[in-house]
Amino acid sequence: MSKSSSKLLKVYTRNNLDPAVKESTVKILNQILANLIDLSLLTKQAHWNMRGSNFIAVHEMLDTFRTSLITHLDNVAERAVQIGGTALGTTQTVSTTSQLSAYPVEIHNVQDHLKELADRYGIVANHLRDTIEEIQDPISEDIIHAALEDLDQYLWFLEANIEQDKTTA
């Protein structure tokens, strides 16, 4: 197998996936990687800076989320390299590629953090759901399914902890 001339495929591999499939998959994986890195960092931002009711339960819950996110983003990055791509996980790339809006660093209330996190977990989970049909590599599809399964659960946990206004509930 010869080396690819693709801009995204720079690493030689004996993996025989079609080069076009590799290229489109690496592009999708790198978008997912940027989103997951950003989500893991803002999860820690909330974890460090929250105060209020249910602090310790939410604080500890977010630690488990972040640990899981690190595993998923590592799997995504490694898959991009396994099929001949480059994992683009620098802070510079994440800051320009992530689909998440800037996290409000001035908030401290647990409920405010839960709402901000739920919005962003929803964005990332929905992006995974929307792009999974575009993946033509079964291994990458499995990796995305695993991440989506956890993100949907975490979104549910976040939403379950958001206190509803009694006038609108």
UniProtKB/Swiss-Prot annotation:
NCBIfam families according to UniProt: PRK09448.1 (NF006975)
Disulphide linkage map: none
Family: Belongs to the Dps family.
A GO term for molecular function: DNA binding
Keyword Nucleotide-binding (UniProt): no
HAMAP family noted in UniProt: Dps (MF_01441)
Organism expressing this protein natively: Acinetobacter baylyi (strain ATCC 33305 / BD413 / ADP1)
Protein name from the UniProt record: DNA protection during starvation protein
Pfam families, per the entry: Ferritin (PF00210)
Database matches in InterPro entries: DPS_DNA-bd, DPS_DNA-bd_CS, Dps_gammaproteobac, Ferritin-like, Ferritin-like_SF, Ferritin_DPS_dom
The reaction(s) this protein catalyses: 2 Fe(2+) + H2O2 + 2 H(+) = 2 Fe(3+) + 2 H2O
E.C. no: 1.16.-.-
Keywords of the record: Cytoplasm, DNA condensation, DNA-binding, Iron, Iron storage, Metal-binding, Oxidoreductase
